[in-house]
């Protein structure tokens, strides 16, 4: 009986541990912007969760880093758990959904193409990237 009870408790604990795994989607809108949506596997919204975009290569310089990579943008998801924003100018980047220790996941983002450049210029002019402008636009 004791072994059975320990087994049941173990199974329940593992189900609880995986009940709210973080999820992220990074979709290419084809117009120089990306749609980022985050949430949890139990259906909870990612509203207010921090989004971090990093260059997809190791970095050991003076700029702020996350997981050993240079941060080029930090922001938060809106009330719908999403954000539509211009693609970073860097060729390779990764988007992190950072809901705290043990609740971090990431996905590589689509690169900006030459065909999207005109639309991207408009998107970057209207989207407020705040203090991250130089890093996002590589200026």
Regions found by a protein language model. Give the residues of each.
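Short, aromatic- and glycine-rich surface loops/edge beta-strands on solvent-exposed regions
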Residues: 89-103
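Beta-strand-rich domain onsets/edges
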Residues: 18-39, 117-139
């Amino acid at each position: 009986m004791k072994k059975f009870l320990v087994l049941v408790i173990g199974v329940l604990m593992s189900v609880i541990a995986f009940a709210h795994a973080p999820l992220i989607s990074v979709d290419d809108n084809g117009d120089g912007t990306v749609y980022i949506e985050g949430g949890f596997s139990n259906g909870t919204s990612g509203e207010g969760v921090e989004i971090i975009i990093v260059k997809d290569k190791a970095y050991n310089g003076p700029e702020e880093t996350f997981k050993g990579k240079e941060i080029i943008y930090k922001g938060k998801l809106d009330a719908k758990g999403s954000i539509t924003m211009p693609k970073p100018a860097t060729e390779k980047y990764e988007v992190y959904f950072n809901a705290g220790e043990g609740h971090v996941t990431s996905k590589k983002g689509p690169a900006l193409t030459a065909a999207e450049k005109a639309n991207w210029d408009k998107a970057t002019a209207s989207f407020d990237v705040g203090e991250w402008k130089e890093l996002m636009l590589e200026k």
